[in-house]
Amino acid sequence: MGIPELLSSVVCPGGQGDVSIVDNLLIMSVEQTRSRIDCGLQGVSKEASPDRFRGIRIFDISNLSQPKQVGAVQTCRGSHTHSVVAGPDQDGKIIVYNSGTQGVRDEEEMEECIGNIPGDNRTALFRIDVIEIPLSLIHI
């Protein structure tokens, strides 16, 4: 038996960090508002920004010494935790349930994100996201 060792590390701020592995893909929860889609270290302004990332990141880990981000799915409240519930199926899709606990993004940043409007059933406050990851669109 060998001694466990660190093979590689990826710097990609965003907090939370729950992970799941499906074949050669690593799916990672990202919740904090400072994270960027490009994994940059400079953070994001407090205003609505196309650079901000909150949701799940998808990494190709077929080469463990060089993991690389190959996909990302934005969500209204980020991803505090997720569960892979199916896949890949015969159509080459992975299904992930996602739950975020951060505040709802501004609609300026993500149009379908509706916050606390009394009586509005479309609110993102209490929802669970169902995310479909088609492997044919992931470039690995």
Task: Please annotate each region the language model reported.
Residues 1-138:
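Feature marking well-ordered beta-strand scaffolds used for ligand recognition
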